């Protein structure tokens, strides 16, 4: 009986409100060197970005702008950009990527590229030379299975779930995956995406239905979603940016106007 009384007293003294407090940043936390525009993806927030659009929709142009234009990301990654692209040596739009990071460009996907990136980042963290990184996967979903149980492209799928741990907190880090068809992207990568960029060139009904099924509920339902898609389709080379890392989701048109 005495033990029961002690237990009851213990609960009587418990606080009325329980708060989940944020964990303090580690001592080696790096303060961001560049302040990003609030309407664009922020690599200092650890981004996994999906870029969806058909051929000649401006995917490569958009990515080149993010990687090179000072008003966007500029050169925040320095030499630490790895590119896997079937067309890197034949695409005029991507030539600046090839010139800047030619030693880290690969025409064919192989798990070893990801394994080597992981090893490199682990070593940089140990020696204090870590400055963050960017991994660009350009139209290579034929090398990565959309089936979460498949071993095809498994290294990069697994990497996409924990990539943020391979750099010191506060450094810029991003994975960019561009593809022509949304459903060809690994389910795991779709679920973990922090941002989705949809081209106005996406007109195929099945493709639009796939995107609506995935994201309409995040923006208040199908009516809102279709209104935003129509706004995006008013002009060529337009982009709808869904910031999935926020709750509720934020939606921007051409990184200029907030729609939701």
Predicted region positions:
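Short, flexible beta-strand-to-coil junctions
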Residues: 2-4, 87-88, 242-248
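Pre-Walker A adenine-sensing motif
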Residues: 22-43
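Conserved P-loop NTPase motor cores
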Residues: 37, 47-69, 73, 86-90, ...
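Short, surface-exposed beta-edge/turn micro-motifs
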Residues: 79-80, 132, 236-239
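A structural signal for isolated positions on well-ordered beta-strands in alpha/beta enzyme cores
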Residues: 82, 174-176, 240
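Conserved GTP-binding G-domain of TRAFAC-class P-loop NTPases and closely related GTPase folds
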Residues: 187-260
